[in-house]
C-alpha cells in the first residue's frame, strides 16, 4: 500500500499561462494552498490481453496500465493457466477484471470457477456482459448481480457491465435509452461488493472527406451517463478510448488519445481503457499499442506519454467530485446555430448555465469546462479543448477565465502540477490540439 503523503504545489513560473501578482484584501480567502493525499490511482486499462508472459505484462505496466480485461485468448477461462496469467500480471502491477464473455444461455453455475478469485488481491472485479439490451438487463443481468453479491460477499470485487452507446437502434436496445439507464442504475444500487461502475464505449473520431470528424452524438452520451452516475452516486465512471483504427473510425495519434481522455474527464470519467491494447485477431483492425507478441508499436509510446500525464495529476483530479459541464462555443467556430451555439453543444440537455465562482469565459475553439468540488468545498475545473486534434495547429485553443476571486491557480497540465499567480482574477490557458488542464482557483490570503 502506498504511504500516504501530501501533495503540495509550489509557486512556479510558466510559459503556458498568464502570470503576475494580484492584490487582495484577504477577506474570505484561504490561509494556505489546498493539499491532496498521494493515495489515489487512475484506473487505466487495456482490452485484448498480450501473451501471458512476465515480459508482456511488464511492458503493459511500464506503459502505465493498472488493469486489464482478462479474456481467454491465451489462457482458457477457469484453467490453471488463466489463474497463472492473473498472478503474473499482478506481479507486474497489472490488476485483472475477470471476463465471462456474454454468458449467453448459460446458468450462473457455469461460472463458479470465478468464485475461487474471491480473495485474490490481483482481481478488481468481474465483467459480466458487454452491451446488454433492456430485456437482458432486466433479467439476466439482475440475476448475475444477485449471484455476484452472494459469491463475492464481504470482498472488494466489483460488478461490471459495459453499456450500449446512444447510437444503437431501438430494435437492438429493445427499449428507450432513458429506460436502459434507469434499469442499470437500479441494478447498481443493489451492488454490495467493491466499487460501483458505469461504463460505455463510444468512439468519436471518424473518417470523413476532410480526413476526420468528431461524432456529434458523443457528448450527449457522456452527459447522460454522467448524470446517472451523479444521481445514483456511482463510484467509477469508465469509458473506452479509441486507440486502434477499425470500421469507419480513423487512425489515432498521441493528440487523439489525449483529446479523448480530457473530454471524458470533463464529464467526470475516472477510469479509461484502450480499445485495443493488443493487435486484434480481427484482420480488419489496424495497428494497436502492442503487436500479437506483446511488443510495443509506435502507438505504445503515444499512450505511455498520455498515461504519464494522467498519473501525474491523479492525486489532485481524483480528490474532486464532478458536478456538471459548461460549454463555450469558440470564437473561430463557423458551425453555429442562429443563437451562436456550436452544433456540438446545442442539443445537450444538462449543460450548466454558469460556473460557480466564475464571471465569464472566452475561448477561440469549442471548449468544455467540467466543474468539480473537493471535500473542503474548493472548486476544480477540467478545461478541455474540444476542437478535433486531427487539424493540428488550426485546433489550438486560447481560453480566458475570469474568476470572481482568485489570485492563485493550481494547474495540472502535461506531467506538471504547479501553482501560478493569477492577474486580476483572470487566467489564460493556451491549449494545443487535444490538450486540457485541471485548474483549482484559489483566493489566498497574504
Regions found by a protein language model. Give the residues of each.
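N-terminal secretory signal peptides that target proteins for export/translocation
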Residues: 1-2
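Sec-dependent N-terminal signal peptides
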Residues: 5-14
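C-terminal motif of bacterial Sec signal peptides marking the signal peptidase cleavage site
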Residues: 18-21
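Glycan-processing catalytic domains of CAZymes
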Residues: 26-407, 412-446
Amino acid at each position: 500500500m502506498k504511504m500516504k503523503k501530501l501533495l503540495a504545489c509550489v509557486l512556479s513560473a510558466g510559459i503556458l499561462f498568464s502570470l503576475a501578482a494580484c492584490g487582495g484584501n484577504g477577506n474570505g480567502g484561504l490561509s494556505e494552498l489546498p493539499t491532496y493525499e498521494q493515495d489515489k490511482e487512475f484506473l487505466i486499462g487495456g482490452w485484448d490481453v498480450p501473451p501471458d508472459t512476465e515480459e508482456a505484462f511488464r511492458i503493459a505496466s511500464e506503459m502505465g496500465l493498472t488493469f486489464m480485461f482478462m479474456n481467454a485468448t491465451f489462457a482458457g477461462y477457469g484453467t490453471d493457466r488463466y489463474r497463472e496469467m492473473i498472478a503474473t500480471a499482478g506481479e507486474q502491477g497489472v490488476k485483472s477484471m475477470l471476463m465471462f464473455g456474454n454468458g449467453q444461455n448459460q446458468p450462473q453455475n457455469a461460472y463458479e470457477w470465478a468464485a475461487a478469485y474471491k480473495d485474490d488481491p490481483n482481481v478488481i472485479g468481474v465483467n459480466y456482459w458487454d452491451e446488454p439490451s433492456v430485456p437482458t438487463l432486466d433479467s439476466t443481468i439482475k440475476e448475475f448481480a444477485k449471484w455476484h453479491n452472494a459469491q463475492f460477499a464481504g470482498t472488494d470485487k466489483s460488478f461490471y457491465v459495459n453499456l450500449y452507446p446512444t447510437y444503437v437502434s431501438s430494435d437492438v436496445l429493445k427499449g428507450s435509452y432513458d429506460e436502459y439507464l434507469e434499469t442499470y442504475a437500479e441494478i447498481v444500487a443493489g451492488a454490495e461488493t467493491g466499487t460501483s461502475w458505469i461504463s460505455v464505449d463510444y468512439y468519436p473520431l471518424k473518417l470523413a472527406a476532410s480526413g476526420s470528424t468528431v461524432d456529434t452524438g458523443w457528448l450527449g452520451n457522456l452527459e447522460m451517463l454522467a448524470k446517472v452516475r451523479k444521481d445514483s452516486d456511482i463510484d467509477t465512471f469508465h469509458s473506452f478510448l479509441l486507440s486502434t483504427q477499425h470500421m469507419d473510425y480513423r487512425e489515432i495519434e498521441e493528440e487523439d488519445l489525449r483529446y479523448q481522455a480530457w473530454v471524458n474527464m470533463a464529464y467526470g470519467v475516472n477510469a479509461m481503457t484502450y480499445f485495443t491494447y493488443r493487435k486484434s485477431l480481427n484482420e480488419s483492425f489496424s495497428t494497436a499499442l502492442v503487436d500479437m507478441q506483446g511488443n510495443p508499436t509506435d502507438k505504445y509510446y503515444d499512450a505511455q506519454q498520455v498515461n504519464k500525464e494522467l498519473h501525474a495529476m491523479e492525486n489532485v483530479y481524483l480528490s474532486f467530485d464532478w458536478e456538471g459541464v459548461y460549454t463555450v462555443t469558440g470564437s473561430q467556430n463557423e458551425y453555429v446555430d442562429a443563437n451562436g451555439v456550436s452544433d456540438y453543444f446545442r442539443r445537450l440537455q444538462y449543460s450548466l448555465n454558469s460556473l460557480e465562482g466564475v464571471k465569464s469565459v472566452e475561448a477561440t475553439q469549442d471548449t468544455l469546462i467540467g466543474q468539480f468540488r473537493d471535500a473542503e468545498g474548493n472548486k476544480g475545473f477540467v478545461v478541455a479543448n474540444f476542437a478535433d486534434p486531427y487539424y493540428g495547429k488550426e485546433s489550438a485553443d486560447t481560453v480566458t477565465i475570469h474568476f470572481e476571486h482568485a489570485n492563485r491557480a493550481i494547474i495540472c497540465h502535461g506531467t506538471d502540477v504547479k501553482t501560478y499567480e493569477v492577474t486580476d482574477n483572470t487566467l489564460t490557458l493556451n491549449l494545443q490540439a487535444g490538450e486540457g488542464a485541471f485548474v483549482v482557483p484559489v483566493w489566498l490570503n497574504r
